Amino acid sequence: SFSVGVLTRAASDMGHAFPFGLSLLPNYSEFANLFDRYRLRRVDVRIAMVQKNNHTTSRFPTVWAYMDDDDASIPLTKNAVLERQSVRPFTFSDAKTVYSVSIQPRWLLDSTNKASLAPRDMWIDMSTPSVSHYGLKMWVDDYNSSYDSIISVDATIHFECQCVR
């Protein structure tokens, strides 16, 4: 489990993309010394509101999250996010401060060809731990509040290794 990032919102909305990979894990090289291959099975993502904006009349932020497994481009507009079929909204509140989602990220066999999605069960050589696995994109809508909200994004990567050295 590790922190993917902390988002501070102040008076603007913003898109985010989160590619995952073995190289993001602390001390991943320990596994590289022990095994020949790996594959990412699942990523559990926890999006939590650490600090709400402290103005009593301001609204809580809404996170619009969706699965996109062909690139790591950041969504540029809220409308582009809302056009996605699988988008899921989550509005934080005093009672709902955490949004959790589990994804199965994908990677491309050829990074220049978006049609080259690798099969989910395909093993990757340990010599390439920085292969990007695409999956989660989101838009944070802070309703143009002039007060800050802090949102943390944490991930737990579930992976398998094969062929002990």
Task: Please provide the spans of the model-predicted regions.
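Capsid-like jelly-roll
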Residues: 1-165
